[in-house]
């Protein structure tokens, strides 16, 4: 069994909702300016007692409850984040403790920026095949509001906080995964021990050019590997960075826009959390078709990128 099959999801969003109008009172911007350039209307920011770790724990607990599995069934926990509240312990170890996962199983954080969830899938799959076990918990969580300069309109309008979790199992079902990285000075964020002292900065134009090239290529790669077509997929879930990026991808692929899920209008760019948050929304609303494959494609700082095709549980 070489593939991963999605069996359960969970999600968590902070209690504080920030509208474009609220941001227009903080920086020189407007709802029309933000919406026309990004497609974002609202985003969620952590309250004082929330963090990437608390959100991850809530999302993971929901996924575990929905899976019908016991904590002892989880063979590994991988958490993708660039905004962990502590240098150590990792968010994954905090999740392990909170959910009562076995102590003799690996738990670790990784940072591949907005591609992190896809990288996390690869790490989890490798652990299952190398160390044994059937089920993996993969989380993407962020508290990017803690890493932003609230006076920088080029970033504060984009980013939101949130967490998504997914439980995968090894399965002989359609599966493909591709990852890549290209060293580049596109996104910088201060380390967790210096939270807030080195805020996120981004070369938006460079990221846009990179993304509209990388996303279609990633999707073609995993489609070719599985010998599937776009028509075979139930959904294509892109990293939710910017509506215009996804629209360019749709045009390049000559694809049906209805097949591409979007939620950045409500959540903004939640980096590593964006893909699993979207998966959870699709699962909660009954829009994931059991037994049918779907694709996830993402890109992020580094530069990094990735794509995956996998099946939702039968």
Q: Where is each model-derived feature located?
A:
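Buried hydrophobic positions in well-ordered alpha/beta secondary-structure cores of metabolic enzymes
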Residues: 6-8, 34, 63, 77, ...
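Phosphate/pyrophosphate-binding loops at sites that engage ATP/ADP/AMP, CoA/4′-phosphopantetheine
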Residues: 59-75, 217-234, 282-287
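Condensing-enzyme catalytic core mediating Claisen C-C bond formation in acyl metabolism
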Residues: 1-48, 150-209, 213, 217-220, ...
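Claisen-condensing/thiolase-fold acyl-transfer catalytic domains that form or cleave C-C bonds
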Residues: 53, 57-60, 64, 83-84, ...
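Acidic-glycine-rich active-site phosphate/pyrophosphate-binding loop
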Residues: 27-36, 86-100, 137-144, 189-194, ...
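Glycine/charged-rich beta-loop-alpha catalytic/anionic-binding loops adjacent to active sites
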Residues: 40-42, 73-78, 97-111, 145-151, ...
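Flexible, glycine-rich active-site loops centered on histidine and acidic residues
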Residues: 127-160
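Short beta-strand segments
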Residues: 80, 111, 136-142, 168, ...
């Amino acid at each position: 069994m070489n593939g991963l099959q999605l069996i359960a999801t969970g999600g968590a969003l902070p209690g504080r909702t920030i509208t474009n109008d609220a941001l227009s009172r903080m920086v020189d911007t407007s709802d029309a300016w933000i919406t026309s350039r990004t497609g974002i209307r609202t985003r969620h920011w952590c309250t004082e007692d929330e963090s990437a770790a608390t959100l991850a724990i809530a999302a993971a607990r929901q996924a575990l409850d929905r899976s019908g599995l016991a904590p002892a069934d989880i063979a590994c926990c991988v958490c993708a984040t660039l905004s962990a509240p502590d240098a150590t312990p990792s968010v994954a170890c905090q999740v392990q403790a909170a959910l009562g996962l076995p102590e003799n199983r690996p738990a670790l954080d990784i940072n591949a920026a907005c591609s992190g969830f896809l990288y996390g899938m690869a790490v989890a799959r490798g652990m299952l095949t190398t160390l044994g076990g059937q089920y993996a918990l993969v989380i993407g969580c962020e508290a990017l509001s803690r890493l932003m300069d609230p006076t920088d309109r080029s970033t504060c309008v984009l980013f939101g906080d949130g967490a998504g979790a997914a439980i995968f199992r090894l399965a002989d079902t359609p599966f493909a995964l591709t990852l890549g990285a290209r060293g580049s000075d596109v996104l910088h964020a201060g380390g967790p021990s210096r939270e807030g002292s080195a805020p996120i900065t981004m070369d938006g134009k460079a990221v846009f050019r990179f993304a509209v090239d990388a996303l279609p290529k990633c999707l073609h790669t995993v489609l070719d590997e599985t010998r599937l077509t776009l028509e075979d997929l139930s959904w294509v879930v892109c990293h939710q960075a910017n509506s215009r990026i996804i629209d360019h991808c749709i045009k390049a692929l000559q694809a049906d826009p209805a097949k591409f899920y979007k939620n950045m209008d409500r959540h903004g760019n939640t980096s590593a959390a964006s893909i699993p948050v979207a998966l959870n929304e699709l699962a909660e609303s009954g829009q994931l078709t059991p037994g049918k494959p779907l694709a996830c494609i993402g890109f992020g700082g580094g530069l990094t990128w990735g794509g995956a095709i996998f099946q939702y549980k039968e």
